[in-house]
């Protein structure tokens, strides 16, 4: 298992009643490996303030398998205006060190910098970003061909599978997103050793 395997994830939506107007939406999930709970994940979509909407994701993971130890506290913050990403920040605090990623709209392009565990990336993106990995946690990615990966600073390709199932692929990393009634209930992150399962908590 590698550190980016867990950092692939962001959040997932909970089943239940629609939020009241002006209320934040919160989704809580458990993260499992080999049937064992190893962490939690919480995604929040704040109530819109004018044209602005803020999304956040917090993941807290601890894995201890024999000689394999992993600790990750991971936070994503995305700010959208009129449906376009203006600023995305990622902070990861791990037993391998502290890491960060940032994508910021400069009026005619994004400055993108990702400095994560064994992953360093710089880019300029001129196309407005309107869909990110975090957005997948608040509804099916119907009609979306790709999602901006906040952690990596580039994109996952999205494709639809049978039923309300979607596949995300980037550089050999694969995940399956499963929806029920438009709500994301499970993510299966494929891993050569053990898959990571993220499940909606009751």
Per-segment meaning from a language model:
Residues 23-27, 31-105:
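N-terminal mature ectodomain segment of secretory-pathway/periplasmic proteins
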Residues 3, 17-18:
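Amphipathic/hydrophobic helical signal segments and adjacent flexible N-terminal regions
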Residues 9-16:
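Hydrophobic h-region of N-terminal signal peptides that target proteins for export
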Residues 22-24, 89-201:
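Solvent-exposed helix/loop surface patches that form functional interfaces
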Residues 1-8:
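Sec-dependent signal peptide recognition
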């Amino acid at each position: 298992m590698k550190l980016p395997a867990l950092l692939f994830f962001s959040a997932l939506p909970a089943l239940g009643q629609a939020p009241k107007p002006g209320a934040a939406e919160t989704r809580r999930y458990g993260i499992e490996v080999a049937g064992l709970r190893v962490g939690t994940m919480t995604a929040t979509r704040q109530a819109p303030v004018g044209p602005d909407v803020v999304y956040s994701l917090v993941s807290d993971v601890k894995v201890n398998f024999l000689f394999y130890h992993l600790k990750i506290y991971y936070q994503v913050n995305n700010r959208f205006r009129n449906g376009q990403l203006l600023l995305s920040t990622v902070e990861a605090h791990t037993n391998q060190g502290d890491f960060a990623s940032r994508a910021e709209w400069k009026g005619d392009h994004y400055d993108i910098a990702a400095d994560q565990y064994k992953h360093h990336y710089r880019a300029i993106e001129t196309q407005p970003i309107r869909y990110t990995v975090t957005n997948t946690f608040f509804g099916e990615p119907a009609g979306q061909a790709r999602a901006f990966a906040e952690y990596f600073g580039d994109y996952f390709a999205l494709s639809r599978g049978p039923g309300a199932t979607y596949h995300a692929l980037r550089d050999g990393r694969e995940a399956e997103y499963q929806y029920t009634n438009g709500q994301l209930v499970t993510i299966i992150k494929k891993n050569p050793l053990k898959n990571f399962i993220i499940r909606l908590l009751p």
